Amino acid sequence: MLRLGSHVSMSGKKMLLGASEEAASYGSNTFMIYTGAPQNTRRKPIEELNIEAGLEHMKAHDMADIVVHAPYIINIGNSVKPETFELGVNFLQSEIERTRALGAKQIVLHPGAHVGEGADKGIKQIIQGLNEALIHDQDVQIALETMAGKGSECGRTFEELAQIIDGVTHNELLSVTFDTCHTHDAGYDIVNDFDGVLNEFDKIIGIDRLKVLHINDSKNERGAHKDRHANIGFGHIGFDALHYIVHHPQLSNIPKILETPYVGEDKASKKAPYKWEIAMLRNGEFDPDLLNKIQNS
């Protein structure tokens, strides 16, 4: 079954229930959430996440395979500042607990940045951090994300991700999130040769580790190492390639999550594009006037 959804907000009093309601309003049957603001460590206690009501709504609306995203502030690749590394390890452990409580099996993590110390040193630090953070009997996997290679990001090639996975003791607890924008921006030709890229992924990492797909178009040309998401069909990847990936038979059981930009001239009038983009990806017809329609809706 095609599991297609988007990033939604989990906030206010409704928390998980509100996230599921937002996802349902877009015609989604899965979704991704942050457990709080991605740029800080302020979090509500688990008992205030409104989990029971959220799970009931999810069941009634056929929501499944939901995904949690770890916050950006976690950087277990930092070997320069021990306090940043320790914060990352400790906060990752508490995020895993929240993920489990929410009933999710995957928590997406940007592997980390080496902050000028070089990829090898960054990767060693990430391995150390994951070895500290992972508890062997946990039932949540950390889904390491394919990165664009912006700045000092680690995980910009399949080889770098494989290096991290191979170094972690309990690597059965590691999976991978394949982000179409990041992978394109890292230099992989997912537009003309997605099957070739997928075969390469399978040889280097193993397709069985692929557990989450982030479906985003890109504002930049292939290999730009920028990581700037575009709306579906309005970037350098294009609708046909993204539709092909979403409906790829080898990826049929993997949740597909949109993280495309809100549409509008200014912050106050921006609108979520997900209802329209999900419908387009399901029915297979690109609407070149979509952005105007969203703005005028």
Swiss-Prot record:
Q: Which PROSITE patterns match?
A: AP_NUCLEASE_F2_1, AP_NUCLEASE_F2_2, AP_NUCLEASE_F2_3, AP_NUCLEASE_F2_4
Keywords, ordered alphabetically: DNA damage, DNA repair, Endonuclease, Hydrolase, Metal-binding, Nuclease, Zinc
Q: Which InterPro entries match?
A: AP_endonuc_2, AP_endonuc_F2_Zn_BS, Xyl_isomerase-like_sf, Xyl_isomerase-like_TIM-brl
Q: Name one GO molecular function term.
A: DNA binding
GO biological process terms, semicolon-separated: base-excision repair
**Record field: catalytic activity:** Endonucleolytic cleavage to 5'-phosphooligonucleotide end-products
Give binding positions for Zn(2+) 2: 145, 179, 214, 259
Query: Which cofactor is essential here?
Result: Zn(2+)
* Listed Pfam families: AP_endonuc_2
**Under which EC number(s) is this enzyme classified?**
3.1.21.2
Gene3D superfamilies with a match to the protein in the record = Divalent-metal-dependent TIM barrel enzymes
| Residues at which Zn(2+) 3 binds | 182, 227, 229
Family the entry assigns: Belongs to the AP endonuclease 2 family.
| Listed name of the protein | Probable endonuclease 4
| Organism listed in the record | Listeria innocua serovar 6a (strain ATCC BAA-680 / CLIP 11262)
| Gene name as annotated | nfo
